[in-house]
């Protein structure tokens, strides 16, 4: 029996960081139950200097909106195409080109990271979730009280096995050649498509699926499956503060979560 979208229960929430900074929430999410489209994005921007230097222009927020709107529009227009993989890849490629146009209007000297976004973009077709992941967002599948982590580990592994040297990976796969983080992000460069990872999950009745930004990653990874099953996205976001590194209390990062119960 096929999983029908009208049997799917969906909850979601987003919360900006709790620090006294000028930076707004740069996460983005999209839930379209009717079309089976679910997206979580995490914006990346770093100004030279401190966030407290207000007013803070959220270039990553702007990029996230550009990317999200373009990806969603493309997927909606091509849902009847036979290959979800091709739909997703073409959607993010075209959206990334739009980021490139945005970036050309900005001075790259304004940021130590180029304005960009990363995340998990997914389509539910029948019993199967097809998804692309880029960066350090995370997916968790709970089945029979056991957890399967996907998304973040898949992307990190892909970067780790890259044959390029460390410095080459910085230049190719991150926003900025001098930055210490070396995962792919959608920053307008064509090379980002080399780091886009596609996969699929065959779903069972009773499965619970989480798509989240990295601010909740440790909580999803280390908490017991039964606790995740029973908690709302808001409760999970609240509880994730215990994993935030000192000296920050809750919400050291923007936190966004979509919970899908099949």
Describe each region flagged by the PLM.
Residues 1-262:
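PP2C/PPM-type serine/threonine phosphatase catalytic domain
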